[in-house]
């Protein structure tokens, strides 16, 4: 069977499963999620062996530390993925929820009800945890899912898929509920992006190249999960100890994720007090600093930042720094270089904070907190499928509700339209 026929068959299977899955009870879906968690833990050794193969290939091909971190699995991470499945099982089922009900003057009763999107394709890079997160959220929200992970994680993803799919089938979910594309050829993605008849939506999750390719080439509707060129702006009134703590957390806790800070903007009134000490601390933690001319005057040994640096999602221990003369200049910089993901201001000035909240166009905007909180778990949604930076159909962390659409139900007693 060639690539096209193989992907087409998987899409047909998933589409067929979606019809059955959309009408399955919450109890069956929850039982499946629990069984998937059990199988994940039961097959831990096989998954770790498969992950070692991927890690060896990644290291031999010179992948950076942030990439290796995203790819790495260990017992704790597998247990965390299993725990995530259990948490999703404990969340309220959005399917069938009546979000609004009203009666018209002609006695028609009209309701708006949550229903599944249908069949969802997830295209992602070297993030084995996405295999579990995506499957969990799709199952609970009554959607079938087609998973296409990056070739760098093919062994890990396949081992995870085999475990969770076994659990799903044994618990009574229809075959095809979770499909996995184990082909690494580029054509596999190209085929998936054109299967409008069987796939309702595609969600790409990864770097800018992947997302751009899917958005530009897919005929299937796309929910764009975001590139995270996130900024922290330290205002003239900021508590500098708080600013240091937030900046260090936002940059170094997990530099390889989309809600990590990539650019630090500092008001010139506090630049001399903040930048030398903060950048010394960051440098000791392995962060490379690239700054504007004003920053370089304060710390001469750094590399001069370019426009490309300010536009870059580094996903690494690299930080671009710029000294600005005002909140206006900070807002202009974010408007020019931001990716509508997560932006933060550190300030003790109420007027500045409210202006920042109003004027910054992003999925999540923070006052005196780290950008690292843009996450489904941290927002209380449970697991997430990704962070949407577009405005249709969803924005921000995408949990269960964001994987549904609406259906109008209308009760009548023989009414006809005049």
UniProtKB/Swiss-Prot annotation:
Q: List the disulfide bonds.
A: none
* Catalytic activity reported: L-glutamate 5-semialdehyde + phosphate + NADP(+) = L-glutamyl 5-phosphate + NADPH + H(+)
Q: Which gene encodes it?
A: proA
Summary of the function given for this chain in its UniProt record? Catalyzes the NADPH-dependent reduction of L-glutamate 5-phosphate into L-glutamate 5-semialdehyde and phosphate. The product spontaneously undergoes cyclization to form 1-pyrroline-5-carboxylate.
| An annotated GO BP | L-proline biosynthetic process
Task: Give the signal sequence positions.
Answer: none
Recorded hits in NCBIfam families, A to Z, give: PRK00197.1, proA
Q: Which domain of life, per UniProt?
A: Bacteria
EC class: oxidoreductase
An example GO CC term for this entry is: cytoplasm
Organism of provenance:
Clostridium kluyveri (strain ATCC 8527 / DSM 555 / NBRC 12016 / NCIMB 10680 / K1)
Q: Name one Pfam family in it.
A: Aldedh
GO terms (molecular function) for this protein are: glutamate-5-semialdehyde dehydrogenase activity; NADP binding
The protein, known as: Gamma-glutamyl phosphate reductase
User: Matching PROSITE patterns, A to Z?
Assistant: PROA
UniProt keyword terms in alphabetical order: Amino-acid biosynthesis, Cytoplasm, NADP, Oxidoreductase, Proline biosynthesis
Q: Which family does it belong to?
A: Belongs to the gamma-glutamyl phosphate reductase family.
Instruction: Name the EC number(s).
Output: 1.2.1.41
What does the record list as coiled-coil region(s)?
none
Q: Spell out the subcellular localization from the entry.
A: Cytoplasm
The pathway it acts in is: Amino-acid biosynthesis; L-proline biosynthesis; L-glutamate 5-semialdehyde from L-glutamate: step 2/2
Which InterPro entries does this UniProt record tie to the protein? Ald_DH/histidinol_DH, Ald_DH_C, Ald_DH_N, Aldehyde_DH_dom, G-glutamylP_reductase_CS, Glu-5-SA_DH, GPR_dom
